[in-house]
Regions:
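Non-DNA-binding regulatory cores of transcription-related proteins
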Residues: 79-156, 162-164
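Helix-rich terminal scaffold detector
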Residues: 1-67
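Preference for short coil/turn "hinge" residues that link or interrupt alpha-helices
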Residues: 4, 39, 71-72, 119, ...
C-alpha cells in the first residue's frame, strides 16, 4: 500500500479567489479557440494557415494553464489572514518597513507577505521565499533585517505588522 503525501501551500483568500477567476476565464475562452481551429481547418491547406497554427498554440497554452491552475487550487490551503494577530511577521502579514535612501532620507514601504503563487512586486505582494520576505519572517516590530540586493545591502526596520 502506497500513500502519497500532498504538499499543501498557504494562500490568502484573495489569492485563491483570483486563481478561481482565472480558471473560469480560461474555461470560458477554450470553446471559442476550438471553434477558431475548426474554422481555420475548413479553409483548407493547414501547412500555411497561420490562423490555424496560432489557434492551436493558444489552445495548448490554455489547456496547460487550466491544468496548472486546477492543480494549484487543489493543493492550496486558504489562510484567513484577518483571523491572525500579533506583532511577528508571518505569512499573510502586511508589514510596514522603513529604510534609508542613498541621500540618508527615510522612506517607508508596505508589503504583504504571500505565497510565491500570488506574489506580485508591482502590487507590493512579496513571497515568503523572496530575499526580503524570507528575511522578515519571524521578526517583530522594531527589529532590523539586512537584505542583499543587486547593488549591495539594504537595511530595513520593521515599523508595523498588521493582519488585514
Amino acid at each position: 500500500m502506497t500513500s502519497s503525501i500532498v504538499n499543501k501551500f498557504p494562500i490568502t483568500r484573495e489569492g485563491f479567489e483570483s486563481m478561481q477567476v482565472e480558471l473560469e476565464k480560461l474555461k470560458e475562452e477554450k470553446p471559442s479557440i476550438i471553434q477558431a481551429i475548426s474554422d481555420a481547418r475548413d479553409q483548407g491547406d493547414l501547412s500555411e494557415n497561420a490562423e490555424y497554427h496560432a489557434a492551436r498554440e493558444r489552445l495548448g497554452f490554455i489547456e496547460g494553464r487550466i491544468i496548472e491552475v486546477e492543480s494549484k487550487l487543489s493543493h492550496a490551503e486558504v489562510i484567513e489572514v484577518k483571523s491572525l494577530s500579533g506583532d511577528t511577521v508571518m505569512f499573510g502579514a502586511t508589514v510596514t518597513v522603513s529604510m534609508l535612501n542613498d541621500d540618508n532620507s527615510e522612506v517607508e514601504y508596505i508589503y504583504k507577505i504571500v505565497s510565491g503563487y500570488e506574489a506580485d512586486a508591482s502590487k507590493q505582494l512579496i513571497s515568503t521565499d523572496s530575499p526580503l520576505g524570507s528575511a522578515l519572517i519571524g521578526k517583530k516590530v522594531g527589529e532590523y533585517v539586512e537584505v542583499i540586493v543587486p547593488n549591495g545591502e539594504k537595511l530595513y526596520k520593521i515599523v508595523k505588522v498588521e493582519f488585514k
